[in-house]
């Protein structure tokens, strides 16, 4: 009995520690990019996956102690996919006492009509979903739209664009929407996916599977995700350093003439950002810059979330 109580206390301690880390990550992202302001009404896009559940939970937690006042409204888009458990999210949100709206739109039918069998439907589905969410934000009077993309998503997008698109472009933590009317924020931008997985598992969120539409996952993104996971396992700190690099760009040492005036460099020009160090012996730190291992990182092997069995 004492052993059980000891394990329970340890689990609660670890959960509290994990929640504090996620809360700190979200708080830093909000502050760095001015994501939330006084009086904001945040539309939290809730898909039923681990990321959006975690985002809602951490924002609710921050709402209680933040120095500014803001409100939350959770929104789920029921796309009429076969087997979608439409009772799960309303029951969960009512239990929490969170304001919410379920938007019912048969985008599944539209996608099936337009896309040949066996082809990836994600692109069209995403465009349809985006338009509906923008419209819903206007109807609800939301000042910001919050999406659940995390640090790993941002890095994956960067490498996808580098490897397949020939450009250095990631996923912005804050942006103006396609229609020019809404500000979109990603509060989980600094959060690690493995932290989100552990948190969702500990909180026992009622996870809804994301493949009810039958669409195949993006193979290119999967390749990138596997590569980054392998690097994270074999070279601790590399992921953190790469993400830091996204926040520490030196345009004068790249090759984009739109970002730096290379043609304007003439005799007498000032040295910019250290000049040319290509022939110097660089001092590379033994540990990745700015990386500190977390105490509980050794327990992160092969974590998976159970999802609700849809009958």
Swiss-Prot record:
Cofactor binding note of this UniProt entry: Binds 1 [4Fe-4S] cluster per subunit. The cluster is chelated by three Cys residues, the fourth Fe has a free coordination site that may bind a sulfur atom transferred from the persulfide of IscS.
Gene Ontology cellular component annotations, sorted alphabetically: cytoplasm
Biological processes, Gene Ontology terms: tRNA thio-modification
UniProt-listed InterPro entries: Rossmann-like_a/b/a_fold (IPR014729), TilS/TtcA_N (IPR011063), tRNA_Cyd_32_2_STrfase (IPR012089), tRNA_thiolation_TtcA_Ctu1 (IPR035107)
Disulphide linkage map: none
Motif (PP-loop motif): 47-52
Residues holding [4Fe-4S] cluster: 122, 125, 213
Catalytic activity: cytidine(32) in tRNA + S-sulfanyl-L-cysteinyl-[cysteine desulfurase] + AH2 + ATP = 2-thiocytidine(32) in tRNA + L-cysteinyl-[cysteine desulfurase] + A + AMP + diphosphate + H(+)
Domain of life: Bacteria
Pathway field: tRNA modification
Keyword terms: 4Fe-4S, ATP-binding, Cytoplasm, Iron, Iron-sulfur, Magnesium, Metal-binding, Nucleotide-binding, RNA-binding, Transferase, tRNA processing, tRNA-binding
Cofactor(s) needed for function: Mg(2+); [4Fe-4S] cluster
Enzyme class: transferase
Keyword NADP: no
Summary of subunit composition and partner proteins: Homodimer.
The protein's role, per its UniProt record: Catalyzes the ATP-dependent 2-thiolation of cytidine in position 32 of tRNA, to form 2-thiocytidine (s(2)C32). The sulfur atoms are provided by the cysteine/cysteine desulfurase (IscS) system.
UniProt protein name: tRNA-cytidine(32) 2-sulfurtransferase
